[in-house]
Amino acid sequence: MRRTTIFLLLLFFFSMAATGATKSLFEKGVDAYRQGNVDEALRVWQSVYERGYESGALCYNLGNAHFRIEHTAQAILFYERAKNLLPRDKDVTANLGLARLSIVDRVEAPVRLIIWNWVDVVRDFFSLRELRLLFIGFGVLSCACIIAAILLSGRVSRTLPTVVLVLWIVFGVVFVWRSILDSQPYAIITVDKVDVKSAPDETAKDVFALHEGLKIRIKSGLAGWLNIELADGRRGWIPAAQAEQI
């Protein structure tokens, strides 16, 4: 028991030290960026990201640095990652929109009923992490309210337990829906141009071409190839090395 406690304490202190070092590196990148040394800031922030540290602020700053040196695809990639973590941040949304102006391809999604646009807004208002926490939180709160209603039968209103239970179900449905959607992730085209094939083979017919910075959905993968789908429903295959997952 004592050895386990010592191990956990050491793990905690090493974790705290690593967090402090990461924060110090991040601030070093901020200082370099403010001084106009974008390449140094990018190098430092990239090293932090490659250590496995991911936050909305880090991804946003990486997007800004790539945008400054005209790395369109990487800028969009990191802005998209930042948006997944900070879905309501206006600066992230604005800069992502600005970066998208450089995209050559214009893919129009089919017209849908306006109610589905509202559903998308509600779904994307929270990050997946936030939805998970809300689902768990309302689940625990629902159990507590139901137990309290049973133990204090006749002395408390059943309105609160009912409302909490409904919210738990709603967030549960949205969380599961979002998880299913995220199981087929999006990616960004990272090369100047890629010819989309009709099959996962270099000799297959070219069906259309895509350019740097376009967002695509990954439907499946096969031996170094990605089966992709565009917002307008077109599908095809591209080499996996020519896109990077968000």
Residue spans for each PLM region:
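Boundary regions of SH3-family modules and the immediately adjacent low-complexity/disordered segments
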Residues: 72, 148-149, 158-191, 198-201, ...
